[in-house]
Amino acid sequence: MRVIFAGTPEFARVALERLLAAGFTVPLVLTQPDRPAGRGMKLQASPVKQCALQHGIAVAQPLSLRLDGKYPEDAAAAKAAIEAAQADVMVVAAYGLILPQWVLNTPRLGCLNIHASLLPRWRGAAPIHRAIEAGDAETGVTIMQMDAGLDTGDMLLLEKTAISPADTTATLHDRLAQLGGRLIVEALEMAACGGLKPTPQPAEGVTYAHKIDKAESTIDWNQPAEVIARRVRAFDPFPGAATTLGADAIKVWSCEIDSCSRTLDAACGQILSIDADGIGVACGAGSLLRLTVLQRAGGKRLPAADFLRGFPLAPGMVLGAAP
């Protein structure tokens, strides 16, 4: 079976590697253009492009696939490459470009998407972050037959995984990437013998995982500790849950909900205790959060005890207050 692969980040690279290991022929890879990255802001190829080049696969990096859009020459060149590949199917995983109808219609078996949620819950760009942020007990991967809508196509395969209280977006991402890679191989093997049975998504339970905005990273200490703790986990590794002390920026990478209730006369964001277990901070609804791993601007992630050696804090200080 000939497979065009469209994807960009590490999540997609894992799937591409699994397809190649399973023996599928991949004549063409579509991925986002190289972007500036790192401290030197040098152009960097996506993980999927790096993988494709290592395996000697042709790569196309159009700015758009819309023939009537802003970059018609890019789209026309991509169309020629896609048609020349004579693929049976296109596999899409976190590609980052909208696929026009002509793309969906070109492969014999259409386009299959690896989506990191249990559809129809968390359609959209950030399903892993939003599942953790919402406190979901489970998530998973759905292999979907793509249509013109936003993650609205028929479901082909689905598998669940539990979200543990310790999961961050980073750990859950890696687990779902492996799951997605395994499921897409199973889906294509089933498709080769006509064994896939499309199931329409239910009309109930639709939610949208909107793209993460960096502005969301600011911790609102008026929220209950449980809500803040979920956001800390959801925003690891990006954008990181952030607060301030005066003019100094601080990121919180790990925390624990303290079962002890706090005095209600303490201001939300006020540091109530500092000990070997971390920094106790007053939160909304009379709750208490213990910060255990922190980072100051330009620094490294550090356990609270090490962080405090270079950034002294004291009970009574208020995090997130205007300088």
Curated annotation (Swiss-Prot):
Alphabetically ordered keywords of this record: Protein biosynthesis, Transferase
Domain of life: Bacteria
Molecular function via GO: methionyl-tRNA formyltransferase activity
InterPro entries linked: Fmt (IPR005794), Formyl_trans_C (IPR005793), Formyl_trans_C_sf (IPR037022), Formyl_transf_N (IPR002376), Formyl_transf_N_sf (IPR036477), Formyl_transferase-like_C_sf (IPR011034), GART_AS (IPR001555), Met-tRNA-FMT_C (IPR044135)
Alphabetized CDD domains for the sequence: FMT_core_Met-tRNA-FMT_N, Met_tRNA_FMT_C
Catalytic activity: L-methionyl-tRNA(fMet) + (6R)-10-formyltetrahydrofolate = N-formyl-L-methionyl-tRNA(fMet) + (6S)-5,6,7,8-tetrahydrofolate + H(+)
Disulfide bonds: none
PANTHER family in the record: METHIONYL-TRNA FORMYLTRANSFERASE, METHIONYL-TRNA FORMYLTRANSFERASE, MITOCHONDRIAL
Known function: Attaches a formyl group to the free amino group of methionyl-tRNA(fMet). The formyl group appears to play a dual role in the initiator identity of N-formylmethionyl-tRNA by promoting its recognition by IF2 and preventing the misappropriation of this tRNA by the elongation apparatus.
Family: Belongs to the Fmt family.
Annotated protein name in UniProt: Methionyl-tRNA formyltransferase
Protein's organism: Acidovorax sp. (strain JS42)
